[in-house]
């Protein structure tokens, strides 16, 4: 009965056996399922009436596309997207994810005996996934414990890229957003006060710092009731910003507000966080620096002494920045049917044979015009004249003489034509340097042996490796199991 209620007329549904509903929300329903053919367990996310609001449909399209382009062991993976029954009229989307048992929010809430080794390994995976994401010039923009999935073996994965954005500049900055609505408690101060018009990956690094502090203490670091209260809590700990930091704030109103704030001195972290490893506190202090220029990048944070004995650059891959061509739809106004067609095209990425047929069909469509081109008209006229001349020759009449002559005009390339080669080269160069072994057919710059080694980095080594083999810490204690998915 559950399967009939969950699935509609999607033919591929028959290969999955729904077990239970594990989540509901405004987006739809998530159910755990099992594939009888493979015996593997997955999470199927059913999104209903996707195209009712174009803005919501674009957000879903963006997230699905980003998850395909950002394949990494520390980022949740889309295994499959079911093919809609009708290309032009489908309304629902079924996305098949790898099944994760819980999320970091639940882990921190129900486990009061997490060890420093847990904290170290959780943070290492988070930063490693973020390094890969930022190297592609992608900002997550909504990092929080609920958006970090977790398993009983302490494996975590970043999820929910619905608010993520891509920067297409030479450096991953210069991005202006007016739709930023991420959770306030993990929001960087420059976003709370709209300090700048351009932001950098440092906004994600602030969120990482807040999450790290929550791991260490078991409670949110800055649980502000509103934006003003949020800034009050931040300055209570970090002190009021220095004149140099204030001078960098472009928003005059925000700069004036902070300048008029009662002078506060920073609280020593050893007082705020007693009994915490000093090495961990030094990293935390770097992550939640008030000035974004003072925060480390994900790559720099991974090199911090806190991860000594665990970090390994060979298992911390990067990738090329994402090509503009992948998100050209962001720059034009789309109708509901436009988004539906783009979504269908993205779904076909998980159906290679149909994708090939679709692309061949596009070529055929593009080769036929509603109206004949100038070349076609010339060919038709030339054929008519030849036929007419043949008739005249049969009647021994003089050949037809043209009144005017002209040379073909030289084609003038538009700026788009001139840049097509460079754009193509850019697209080709944006290949994923690392691909998880779950998708061996995906193009990758690593050998299968190397890819296997990288995936093994998901298993902690040295200090954190003891965590997995310790008799005193069982997997069920590591994670309070409560099924969750992105």
From Swiss-Prot:
Reactions catalysed, as given in the entry: L-seryl-[protein] + ATP = O-phospho-L-seryl-[protein] + ADP + H(+); L-threonyl-[protein] + ATP = O-phospho-L-threonyl-[protein] + ADP + H(+)
Stretches with biased composition (Polar residues): 440-452
Modulation of this protein's activity: Activated by threonine and tyrosine phosphorylation.
Active site: 142
Sorted UniProt keywords: ATP-binding, Kinase, Nucleotide-binding, Phosphoprotein, Serine/threonine-protein kinase, Transferase
The keyword ATP-binding is annotated on this UniProt entry: yes
Annotated positions of the Phosphotyrosine modification: 180
Molecular function terms from GO: ATP binding; MAP kinase activity; protein serine kinase activity; protein serine/threonine kinase activity
Amino acid composition bias (Low complexity), ranges on this chain: 422-433
EC number of the protein: 2.7.11.24
Motif TXY: positions: 178-180
EC class: transferase
Keyword DNA-binding set for record: no
Binding positions for ATP per the UniProt entry: 22-30, 45
Pfam families assigned to the protein according to its UniProt record, in alphabetical order: Pkinase
GO biological process entries: positive regulation of peroxisome organization; protein autophosphorylation
Domain Protein kinase: residue ranges: 16-307
Coiled-coil stretches: none
Family: Belongs to the protein kinase superfamily. CMGC Ser/Thr protein kinase family. MAP kinase subfamily.
This protein's name: Mitogen-activated protein kinase 17
